[in-house]
């Protein structure tokens, strides 16, 4: 059985190397990542069961450890590797974003923030810190809360702006409900942070709300924020 499993693994790798990674199905791609099975199941069988259990690659990437381990033959090692691969992708996206001389590509910025925040189970509040040419200094996740709220304080944000010598920033947070519309609380904290930043001559460029499939720009939809 193990000989057959090994041959199957080699076939998948050969297919990838010969025809390119895009030639593999989702299950085959996951099987290459899993790499090896056990004496009862091949990597392809494990990939099939995991996909059947969780539905799709996005759900697999965002699954918690217990859901992942519910498939016999998959454990903490593979889960840790999967989370590391996911983070590598996020950091690669950030490198692409940093290549911009100036942060002028709004859609690229939205796409990065959406990919980074959309799948968190709890509301998470983040910021892109920029220099006076709107080049990215850092991306940081500053506050995390419950499924429907995160407590946000302007003071730590201002302190971080001063530490990084940032001249501007873009705020972003997710709505785990999937809805991207800004709440009254979102508008209020945006105004409080903008006013706090004014005291240190830093400019708030936007506050982006991330839903499941859409993003909402508080500044684009609420002209008061640009005054």
Swiss-Prot record:
GO terms for molecular function: metal ion binding; metallopeptidase activity. SUPFAM superfamilies: RuvA domain 2-like. Residues 102-225 form the MPN domain. Gene3D superfamilies: Cytidine Deaminase, domain 2. Coiled coil: none annotated. Keywords: Hydrolase, Metal-binding, Metalloprotease, Protease, Zinc. It holds the Pfam family UPF0758_N. PANTHER family: DNA REPAIR PROTEIN RADC, UPF0758 PROTEIN YEES-RELATED. This is UPF0758 protein lpl2409. It comes from Legionella pneumophila (strain Lens).
């Amino acid at each position: 059985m193990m000989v057959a499993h090994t041959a199957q693994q080699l076939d998948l790798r050969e297919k990838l190397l010969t025809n390119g990674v895009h030639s593999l199905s989702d299950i085959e791609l996951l099987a290459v990542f899993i790499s090896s099975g056990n004496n009862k199941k091949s990597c392809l069988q494990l990939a099939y069961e995991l996909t059947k259990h969780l539905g799709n690659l996005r759900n697999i990437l965002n699954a918690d450890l217990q859901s992942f381990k519910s498939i016999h033959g998959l454990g903490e090692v593979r889960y840790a590797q999967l989370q590391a691969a996911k983070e590598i992708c996020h950091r690669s996206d950030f490198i692409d974003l940093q290549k911009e001389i100036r942060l002028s590509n709004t859609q690229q910025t939205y796409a990065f923030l959406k990919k980074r925040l959309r799948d968190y189970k709890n509301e998470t509040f983040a910021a892109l810190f920029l220099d006076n040419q709107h080049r990215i200094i850092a991306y940081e996740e500053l506050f995390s809360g419950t499924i429907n709220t995160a407590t946000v304080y302007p003071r730590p944000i201002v302190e971080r702006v001063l530490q990084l010598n940032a001249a501007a920033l873009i705020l972003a947070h997710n709505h785990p409900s999937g809805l991207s519309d800004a709440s009254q609380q979102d508008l209020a904290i945006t105004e409080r942070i903008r006013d706090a930043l004014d005291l240190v001559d830093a400019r708030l460029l936007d506050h982006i709300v991330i839903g499941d499939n859409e993003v909402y720009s508080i500044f684009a939809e609420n002209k008061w924020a640009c005054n």
